[in-house]
């Protein structure tokens, strides 16, 4: 199941639900579209995402000697190769719901999380490129928090301009998660005590 990543609301007049972005599965098309959608930072991004694009796997647990990893599974030490893509299923990833949330998680992600130095950069034809750790470190060194905010505004905020560019490439999704209703349905005894 491949992810879609939530965009941060830019005003309080939003309809129910959140805007999400997706990306092209084919690598060359993804590179081209990402550069078009995110004009300043696209060349350094994998599909415009701050997190993974690998998706998640669902594996039958009764398979003998199965081992799970975050983005794949192994049976008897061999990575699973047979897969069925659930194209109609959307894995909604809420990576950075607003700039303050982005900053709160930033240092941890830079050191030990999804922006750490040992992760590969977005694939490019020449193999050169900055990974998110190098990009964020460069931005922060040259422009401080204002540069990080500029990045966040282009890549993460559901501005009308970004939504239009995503829609032009069929990568804009509107989803009403309605988490309060889901909690009430599946956990009626605790739904009213959970912070909304």
Residue ranges, per PLM feature:
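Catalytic-site signature of metal-activated, phosphate-bearing donor transferases
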Residues: 1-196
């Amino acid at each position: 199941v491949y992810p879609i990543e939530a965009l941060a609301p830019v005003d309080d007049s939003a309809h129910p639900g959140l805007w999400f972005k997706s990306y092209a599965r084919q690598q060359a098309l993804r590179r081209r579209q990402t550069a078009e959608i995110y004009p300043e930072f696209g060349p350094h991004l994998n599909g415009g995402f701050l997190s993974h694009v690998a998706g998640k796997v669902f594996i039958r647990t009764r398979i003998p000697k199965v081992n799970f990893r975050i983005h794949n599974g192994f049976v008897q030490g061999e990575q699973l190769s047979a897969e069925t893509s659930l194209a109609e299923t959307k894995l909604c990833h809420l990576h950075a719901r607003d700039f303050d949330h982005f900053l709160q998680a930033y240092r941890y992600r830079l050191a030990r999380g999804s922006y750490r130095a040992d992760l590969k950069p977005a694939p490019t034809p020449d193999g050169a490129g900055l990974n998110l750790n190098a990009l964020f470190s460069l931005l922060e060194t040259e422009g401080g928090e204002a540069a990080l905010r500029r990045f966040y505004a282009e890549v993460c905020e559901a501005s009308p301009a970004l939504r239009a560019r995503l829609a032009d490439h069929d990568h804009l999704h509107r989803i009403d998660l309605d988490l309060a209703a889901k909690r009430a349905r599946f956990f009626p005894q605790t739904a009213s005590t959970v912070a909304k």
